[in-house]
Amino acid sequence: MRSYRKLSTFLLSIILLLTLLLTPVQAALLDEVRTIIEAAYVDPVDEALLQADSVEEILEKLNDPHSVFFTPEEYQAFLDSIGDSRFSGIGVQIESVPEGILVVNVLPNSPAEAANIRAGDIILSVDGKSLQGLTTEQAVPIMRGPEGSQIKVTIKRGKSIFALPILRQTVVIPSVKAELLDKNIGYIDIDSFGLESISEFRQGVDALRSKGAKAFIIDLRNNTGGYLVSALDIAGYFIGSDPALKTQSRNKTSITNAYKQRRDISEPSIFLVNEFSASASEILAAAVQDHDKALIIGQTTYGKGTMQRVFQLGSGEGFLKLTTARFFSPNGNTIEGKGIIPDLLIQENDPLKAAQLLLSGSGTSHNITFRIGRLNYSVDTRIAATPDYWSAYQELINQLPDYTLYRLSEESEWQVTDPQQLQESYLFYFPAYQKLNHLESIPEDKEFCISFSQALENESFNKDTLQLIEASSGERIALDFLFLGSRQVVVTPKSKLEEGKSYWLLIHPEVELSGQGKLGIGRVTTIKVGTKESLETIKVL
């Protein structure tokens, strides 16, 4: 019993000593943090956690990466990191990862770009100070500093680790950038949701409309969040004052509506997202997706479905950013840990190209229109068939939902895609072309004899009117032509074809028949390379 009493007295002495070591200000801050967490944290908190001896220990036991204590300097850096900002630093957007700080994006004309830092690099340390285990808010003050000062950053790129000297410079970041693409598509890149974002967005929309924008692409890639009010403002352009999200705090569930704007965006619109689209970005993307106001393209988003509130401690001696609620999409879908799944998952190609294609239709006979969800999007197949867009369109087709409705013109009937059509994807590149035949197991050095029922105008037969295209990449294979009389031509690829690959031999409508004018309707022969030995004749009636 005596030993127990001695131990109890010893432990009590330690607790009293630790308490006495805290200054009155620190003790007051600690008590205030305990009170705030007990009352406002999203989940009930164990009493033992609140009895920890310091703010840092309480937050460590809370095990919530989004609940953070700021010094006044760290809080100012946190505010500077949201939205439009001017600061002295190296010019990177970052996320915290276990090894250190991940570079999400390198700003144009920044010191980081000049030093060849790349997105995907991990910053391990700055001037020998490890960034491992730090939040982004804690890392920012370390990376920023007086203009003209030099720091040495240690970078991990793949398996390589190396150090780089970087000179800090003033970096200015507008949160919204707007430009016109393809003469009629308004492209708006929202870098983050700052307090000025809505006015910048409004100015961008108005300017793009004045330049002739008939559709919009909203780019939320690498946008890690910001002020909720700005996301709700921008959501109002698309969903009016309808519900934008559901929130669930410890004691209640509520619905938050978007803020209706003086003029909505009713033009066809597409949102781009990726794995670094988080928080307020996910709120905006989920809102337009649930209300069927826009198509979402890209990769599954980050999955940060919690909301934080900042509490000032004392008279400004510190600040507590605390998770106070979880949020869900308007339809109640969970975002935390799951993210927003795009309507079209584009991972191998640039989602921007896929979006441009879906908005490229111009009411011509070359359009193919897809109905995705409740919305229609038209592709100009002439653009889709160019080398720059071929691969992106191929992935787009492969990612179409099963049995997607499509039509070949405004006057034609809606049809439904099926697995066979998706395998023969030439239908979506050259929808009006007539299929002649399919050649299987064709050798790598194959020659093709094309036979016409009428005499040809040989001058109309050239590299633009007859093409051999590798189906998956869109690569054009150079050809030699040998005319056999007036009705036959032997076509020889200048390089060997690749075994196992598929090719399309295309006779375009511009080929002319003697005395008859242009062919009018294109022809396609599908080819699978194998080992068969023979001279194939392709007949064009």
Residue spans of the language-model regions?
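A short glycine-leucine-enriched loop at secondary-structure breakpoints
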Residues: P111-I122, R144-P146, A287, K501
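Conserved PDZ fold ligand-binding element
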Residues: A112-L134, F216-D219
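Acidic, low-complexity Ser/Thr/Gly/Pro-rich repeat segments typical of extracellular/periplasmic
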Residues: D418-L541
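C-terminal "post-core" interaction segments
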Residues: E179-I217, R221-L439, L541
